[in-house]
Design a protein with these regions (language model features):
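Mature catalytic domains of secreted/periplasmic carbohydrate-active enzymes
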Residues: 23-406, 416-435, 445-446
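Intrinsically disordered, low-complexity Ser/Thr-rich linker and spacer segments
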Residues: 436-440
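Short, conserved beta-strand segments of beta-strand-rich sandwich/propeller modules, principally
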Residues: 410-414
Length: 447
């Protein structure tokens, strides 16, 4: 109930602010769709790259593997879902088709697919099994459907060499998307990667109009952060400058953008591979690496999409499963139990902690239902003697800011919004004593 009341109060405050400024009223800032809000809440997803190149040792499928050797005989969708849960993730993105064009579902568009595998006598369906397992475990499912298709002669973005070839491939790709959305949905997010030229918006509008389209040429999507290292810049705004039909281009976003299109950080648990290779366990990112990535993505308000690499048998290797669990456990250890927490409206929000406790982190979150409004803020701590001292300054808050600083003993914390694009609603202000190593790059103190 309090969330509904708080949301209504925020809308009332925004209307009052508009009336107070007089003259030409500013445009109301963009706000996320309900689907985007759910995506923000998930914060962490797991990517799963599996294709025939796991039998070849390369990053791209050269189509040299005999079809009777493409045999994920130990694939268990429940194990993949367990990996998602262990990592503390809320969704998965499955690469149902990568650049080679191999389709991991029962498609009518090509024989270069799982239906020509000996697995389950050609009746196996990785995507179908994952869809059922995700529904059962309440994990949201998304799909990467690569526009490039070497089998069909379509290059980057789905671009064919001749007009007649382009028309033929457009029909194939649109049919593949239709099959996925019709037979395996609902989908949480569709990954099209950058530069897709195949017209698909009408298919999405007909079958799944609210879906999050990564790098899609449509509103209500998500965008690439600009690197594959798992690090977001700071600030990394949730809005961009966008025109209908364009692919999102602003990795860091823009505070005055006209479209809500948040960034997603993708990175593989293997360096530098997106796909499994023999003997790759030694290249799994360390727990220290993963925690740094978490601070530099989720800790900057950006979703993290962490890639796992199932092997040639379709199984997530035990070493990766163990590291994913370590990662999830470490995040929970750090941030599951705040010393104190509060929420509220306005430019000043105080949090009483007690009779002087040591803290080294503050987490701040805006209520994104009314948009992203904070433009500059500072966090202060009140020492036991009553003196307020500045702990850190920042610009963006957005979905979440994990703000570390040197350990200090305080009785209270105060958030002061110094600049904003309208009345501010803070959904969370929490103080923590993490007392664990913090990545150097996570510390910041804006002017």
């Amino acid at each position: 109930m309090w969330r509904t009341i708080r949301f209504c109060m925020g809308l009332f405050a925004f209307s009052a602010w508009q009336c107070a400024v007089g003259g030409d009223l500013p445009k109301r800032p963009p706000v996320p769709t309900p689907e985007q809000l759910a995506w923000h809440e998930a914060e962490v997803g797991l990517f799963f790259h599996w294709a025939p190149n796991v039998y070849q040792g390369g990053e791209g499928d050269d189509r040299s593997t005999p079809r009777d050797k493409i045999h994920p005989d130990r694939f268990n969708a429940t194990q993949w879902v367990e990996a998602v849960k262990a990592a503390g993730a809320g969704y998965m993105i499955f690469v149902a088709k990568h650049v080679g064009g191999y389709c991991a579902w029962q498609t009518s568009t090509t024989d270069y697919s799982i239906k020509t595998s000996p697995w389950k006598n050609g009746r196996g369906d990785l995507l179908g099994d994952l869809a059922r397992a995700c529904r059962s475990a309440e994990v949201r499912l998304g799909v990467y459907l690569c526009p490039r298709d070497d089998t069909q002669g379509a290059g980057d973005g789905g671009k064919a060499k001749k007009p007649d070839q382009q028309e033929a491939y457009n029909q194939i790709y649109r049919q593949q998307l239709t099959e996925i959305l019709s037979n395996y949905g609902p989908m949480f997010e569709m990954w099209f990667d950058g530069g897709n030229i195949v017209p698909i918006n009408d298919v999405i509008d007909r079958l799944s109009p609210g879906i999050i389209a990564f790098q899609g040429r449509r509103p209500g999507g998500s965008r690439w952060v600009g690197t594959e290292h798992g690090f977001a810049p700071y600030p990394c705004w949730n809005t961009i400058h966008w025109q209908p039909g364009e692919t999102p281009k602003e990795g860091a976003g823009a505070p005055d953008g006209n479209a809500w299109c948040p960034a997603e950080c993708d990175v593989s648990i293997l360096r530098p591979s997106w796909f499994w290779k023999e003997g790759s366990d030694s290249r799994i990112l360390s727990l220290k690496d993963l925690i740094e990535i978490y601070y530099m993505s989720v800790g900057r308000g950006v979703n993290l999409l962490l890639n796992a690499t199932p092997d040639s048998h379709g199984e997530v290797p035990a070493a990766q499963m163990a590291r994913l669990k370590e990662f999830g456990d470490e995040v929970r250890t750090r941030f599951a139990r705040p010393l104190a927490t509060t929420h509220g409206e306005g430019n000043n929000l105080s949090l009483e902690i007690g009779d002087g406790k040591e803290i080294d982190h503050v987490v701040v979150r805006e209520d994104l239902r009314v948009g992203e409004r904070v433009r500059k803020f500072k966090i202060e701590g009140r020492r036991p003697d009553g003196e307020w001292v500045t702990l850190v300054r920042g610009t963006q808050v957005g979905n979440r800011q994990i703000v570390p600083f040197p350990t200090v003993r305080v009785a209270a914390v105060r958030l002061t919004v110094l600049e904003s694009a309208g009345p501010v609603i803070i959904r969370e202000l929490s103080a923590f004593r993490v007392d664990r190593p913090v990545p150097k790059g996570a510390y910041r103190n804006d002017p």
